[in-house]
Every structure is written in C-alpha cells, then in structure tokens.
C-alpha cells in the first residue's frame, strides 16, 4: 500500500474532494485520451469540417480530445487490479499548501507506478496518467500558476514506451495537465518529433493549433509562458521564423519579452545573465527581421546590438557564450548573400578570418556556409570545391567526393571513380586558398555538399548536351544512393536529409524535363532501407516536387506516392496538398479537389498562394479562419496573376512565394562593416 501524506482529517473523503474528482476516483474504469479524428489517416481519408458563413469553424482547445472510459483487459491479475485501485486513491487528501512534502509524495507515487510488475505497458501508462490527472485536479491553483514538474525517469518511460503514432495525444495530455515541458531531454524529444511531423503536430508543439480563435490567445500564451523556459521559447520562436511562419509571430515575440522581464536576476552574475538574455532575445528579433525582409529595422537593430555587446562588457565573457557574436554576424552575412552583395560579404569575412571568433567551430561552419552559398552566383563548381577542400578535412572530403562521383564529373568530365593513389596525387595539386584559422578539420557536411551539387548541376546543365546531362544526373544519383547504403555510416556527423534528393529531383524535372523520370527516381529512393532514416529538414518536400503540375502521372501513380509517404512517415505538406487540389481541378474532379482542400483546412495551413486562392474563390469554398482578405483584393486588382513558373518553382524553399531581394544602400553596409571591425578590436 502506498504511503499517504501524514495529515489527519476527520471529515469523510467525499467531502474533501470535488464531485467530479470523487466520481472519477470511484469509477470502475480508467481513462485515456482519444482523438476525435485519426490524424495519421489524414492522407487517405476526407476530413469533414463544419462550415459557417463561408469560414471553417475554429478549433478549440477541448476539440482535440475527450475522456472516455476504457474497459480493463480481462486478463489483468488481481494484484494489478489492486495496484490500480491503490494508485487511483493516490493522495486524495487535499493539503492546505503545496510544497516539498506534497511534491515528494507525488514523485514517490509516480516512481512506484513505474516499478509495478505484471502490468502491461498500456495499463502502466494509464496509471501514470491517472496520477498526473489527480495531482492536477487536487491542486488547481498550482496548475494555473506554475505547472507541475515530472521526474526525468517518467518522461524517459513515456519516450520509450509510447508509440510514435500516439505522440500527438501524449503531448496534448501534457499540455492539458500543465506539465512543464523542458525539464527533461526526453520531453524535448517529443517536442522535436512533433515539429518534424505533420502540420497538425507542428501546430500542437508550437501551440498555434489553439490560436486560430482570437479568444484563446490570452489563455494559451499564459500557458506558453508557464510551461516553457526562456531558452526553450527562444528555440520555438526561431523554428517558426526559420519556416517563415509569421501568423502569430508578434504574439510569441511579446511572450519572449514578458519572459525576459519576468526573470529575477540576482547574485554576482545577475547583471551578466540579464545582459546575455537580452542579447539572445535580440538575436531572435534580428532573425525575424532578416526572414521577413525588414532590412531598415534589421540594420538599426544590428548596429545597436553590437554597441550594447561592447558597452555591457559581455566580450569579457565570450568563452562559452560565443553565440552572442556568432548569430548577429551570421545573420548579417546571410543578408549580404541573399542581397547579392558578394564583394561586401568577402570584405567582412576578410576582417573575421584573423579574429578570436575563428577558434569556434560553429562560427567557422556558419562562415563557410555563407561563403560557399554565395558562389552560386558564379556557376563555378570548381571554385566551390577549392574552398570546400581548403576548409574541411581535405583527405576525408576528397574521399567522399570521389565515392559520390562528384570528383570524376568535376575534374574529368565523366563518370569515374579514382583509385586511392590517383586521388591522393590529384589532391596534392590542389592549393590551400584559406588561412589555417578558417580550417574546420572535420569532413564536409551535408549542407555544404548540397551547395556543391547545386553548383555542379547548374554548370553541367549548360555545358553538357541534353543526353549527356541526363547521364550525368543519373550517374550522380546512383552513386549517391550507393554511398548512403554503404559509406555514410562511417562518418560520425553524416545526416541523411532530403536536401540533395531535392536537388536531383529539381534538375531532373525542370532542367532535363523528365517528369516521369523524377517520379521513378523518387520511388526508387524511398524503396531503399536507409529511406526510413532520411529526415525532412526543410519545408520543401520531395513529393511536392514530383507531384506539382505533373500531368504525366495517373491517379494510380499519385495514390502510390501517398502510400510511399505514409509508409515512410513523410507528413503531408501544404505544397503537396495544393498540388493535389490543382491536379483534381485540372481533371475536373470537384469532389477530389474539395477533399484535398479539406485537408488544407483541417491541417490549419496558412493560405497565401494566389493561384490556389483563385481556385477557392471560383469554387465557392470557405476560406480558413483568420484568412488575410487583402489577398482577395489583390486578386481582384491583378487579373494577370499566374502560378509560379516551373523552371523556378523549386530552386529554393519558397515554393509559392515571390522571391524579392532585400535591398539596402552602401552607407548602411559601410556602417555595419565598420561596427563589426570596432567590435572585433574590442574582442582582441
């Protein structure tokens, strides 16, 4: 029998708890969380929505789950039933305060539940859920004000025993139970899993799923502030900015500011910690201004931040806090690159190459990423390769390039794999063009390889005849596939993502003009054993590249794509759903088109794609809640709105967005470069 809190009460138990709680504790069945709609079948089933006044109904916090009794398994032992009963009576005595004693009792009960034998995993999960639910109901003020901390071993058990398909429901349970989200790495893993999942899962992990109804915003943001730490909220907002998901960004930035002001800074390091947090907040603000294209405010914020870093004395504490300079300078370099100001970018890098910042590997990787990406403007893959070999471990990187077939096409203009002695001899003739301070030392990374593939294929599409270019594409693809199967596991930091695959599919579809070949390559790639470990790290889905306006595909082939996506856990994206809507509209299948549009509505995707907006208007379909109606005005005023051209559609992440280059004048550039120089002098 579990120990009870050492406190004596004379009144009956029923008078000491609320009626709903007493009824719940006395019921015969346990409770579980079930979704109203099976989200995992989103790709194969229609998702009907109630429509009102040409708007889809907003989803409320309570719409996502309901509590229903679950019958016990007939095979449960009497011992397990006894334990269930004991735990269901857990600490039913309401204490007047909630402190160390109550938390110790709560923890003890959770740990006792973990150690129960002869109990199925599902029953144990229900036990843990019951304990947490009871705690939440017994101490509503604690839940409302500060939330509940769970021991790390409980989160660990959840991670290893809750099926991946139940992650959505589990996370929703944690939110409703006011469980602090970032007190365990295992809880963070659930967050990351959801962020990489379906649109609904991403919106749950970022709380956006509850924000479509404006009446929820205040309550939900209070929960965000309570359950998140400052650092975890920074990570969440940065993720939204990276995806250019700006729907609720101002609300989240306000929450960050509140979190910044709430923290109590004390002790001898109090001032330093306060300044460090301010810089972290400012870096997130800079990132948002960069991604949203607000160049004028970015320049002002950047200059003020560097001045503050110097004046506050934070440069004296740079070790262990190198991010305070890494991120603002990286954002500025990124702005120079996307503005096609290569000369200014090279000038800043020349200032940085002898600075103390070069001792930080992450900063050097940032630097090389921007430098190599800037070379795309020159269409010179050999130049990209020279810098790659000068920065990363030349021997290991050359071996990777040789195995991938890149070395052969780059330096021999044909498909060939060199022997080790021949490769070593050729590598010896490649001069190092970077100072030692900029050397990273580890093998080349996947993002840098992605840039090299883009540069090589861009150049080859011009220099090679059509048939030769197609052979080049297929040779590089098959060697890449072979490398992932046989070689990639040898490299510790290798990360299987879809970046390189997207490059292949883009050039096969839009440069070689082989849409059916792109379909076959995609299916071939996802038929490989390594495919299940490939992570979607970008907003661009390879299935969208193949499906969008690909009129060579039959209905059966599109269905096969969906099956492959489901089998490999590839979530539906807005781009894929939009592609399917357009496909069915072209086929004059209104029912099929509406079915896919319902998925867009149910997923809570933001709609800004003008061609899709035209379809919605023509079909008389409802627009989503919080739809930006100025886009309708723009549609009326501009009768010549067209879909993006196929040749440029998939060259970057912004499949359905105008690619406007941010512009700023020479005076702004000079001011920013000069303040970087002054900051580096202070660092020295």
Swiss-Prot record:
Keywords: Membrane, Mitochondrion, Mitochondrion inner membrane, Transit peptide, Translation regulation. One of its GO terms (molecular function) is translation regulator activity. It is found in: Mitochondrion inner membrane. One of its GO terms (cellular component) is mitochondrial inner membrane. It is a peripheral membrane protein. Its main location: mitochondrion. Translation factor specific for subunit 6 of the mitochondrial ATPase. Required for assembly of the CF(0) component of the ATPase. Belongs to the ATP22 family. This is Mitochondrial translation factor ATP22. It comes from Saccharomyces cerevisiae (strain ATCC 204508 / S288c).
